[in-house]
Amino acid sequence: MNLSYNDYYTTSGNQDTWEVHLKPCTQKSTTYHAECVRAAQLIAEESSKQIVLMFSGGIDSEFMLNVFKEAQVDFKVAIISYGKWNKHDAIYAFDYCKLHDIVPDIIDLDLEQFVTSGLIYEIAEQGHCSAYQMTSVMHGIKDIDGCIVMANCEPQIGKNYDGKWMWDEPERTNCYRHWYQYAGIEG
């Protein structure tokens, strides 16, 4: 499975050589919500593995779960737990799962050990990651057997300096793409 449908979206380089490459659109898009439902269905069609949705308890990952449910796509849910360090967020994920009769897979990660062991730096290097908070997620997903799908905030769309609308893809979010490729993760 490609990391973007039909390699529509690809990147190259990092730091000073960071580039985003987009192919021309082949069809007119509809609403953001409808396109998300379509994306969920395309992921299901393309995936060779069980779909695993990473759920943080944030509104973006809750939206993702609701979209996959609406698309009638079979999925499992995984939650990364850092114990006391993300209890304030994870509680929403656990409450949602309980309310919707979902039994999540829980990935326990000792955040202090992850940092003090130097693994945080090793993964940052391997994934070309410039955002320390993403490395623990990268570590948490590496051993999940499935097609890993994550939500990552709303689309970053705004007006450019010349008044034209643009889509902004920060380099830091691309570290997941590097990590998926490095670790052989489908998603």
Regions found by a protein language model. Give the residues of each.
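Class I SAM-dependent methyltransferase "Motif I" SAM/SAH-binding loop
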Residues: F55
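Nucleotide-activated chemistry modules centered on ATP-dependent adenylation/adenylyltransferase
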Residues: M1-V52, V67, V73-G187
